[in-house]
Every structure is written in C-alpha cells, then in structure tokens.
Amino acid sequence: MMSKLRVLLTICLLLFPLSALPLDGDQPADQPAKRMWNGKLAARKPRFDKYDLVRGCCPPQWCGPDCTSPCCG
C-alpha cells in the first residue's frame, strides 16, 4: 500500500511540480496606499494658469465667504 502511495505521489509531483506554484515572495508587493496617495495627490493638485500666477490668484475652490482677494470676486 505504501509503495502505491509513493508511486502516486511521485507521478503527481512529476506532472505538477511545486515550483509551478507562485510563492508570495515571487510576487511584486501590492501597494494600495501608494496608488491611493497618487490619486489623491493628482486630484488635489491645483491647476494654475500663468495669468493667475502673475496676478497672485488662487483657484476658485479655495475662495471662501470671507475671501478679500480680487480673484474671488
């Protein structure tokens, strides 16, 4: 009985070697925090026109109700 089991195990290992299985160490590290930060950074990055930089204006979404800048008008 043990010899039959040994033969079966040998055949299975020859047909499907353990090296074919992906190991955790072989996979690139998943970095969801970095992907999220890049997305948030891109979404929060202010988009200035050259004209706005010369005038010293900020983006309209930065203007609050008590803003005294001529750009917030």
Curated annotation (Swiss-Prot):
| Single GO term (MF) | toxin activity
**Modifications after synthesis and translation:** Contains 3 disulfide bonds.
Localization, per the record, is: Secreted
Tissue localization of expression: Expressed by the venom duct.
- The answer to keyword Secreted applying to this record is yes
Where, per the database record, does this protein carry 4-hydroxyproline?
P59, P60, P65, P70
Keywords, sorted A to Z: Amidation, Disulfide bond, Hydroxylation, Secreted, Signal, Toxin
As given in the record, the signal peptide range reads 1-20
Cellular component terms, GO, for this chain's entry?
extracellular region
State the InterPro entries in the record.
Answer: Conotoxin
The record places propeptide residues at 21-55
Extract the Pfam families matched here.
Conotoxin
Its chief place of residence is: secreted
Q: Which residues carry this modification: Cysteine amide?
A: C72
Keyword hit for Hydrolase: no
Q: What is known of its domains?
A: The cysteine framework is III (CC-C-C-CC).
Family the entry assigns: Belongs to the conotoxin M superfamily.
The name on file for this protein is Conotoxin reg3a
Question: What is the scientific name of the source organism?
Answer: Conus regius (Crown cone)
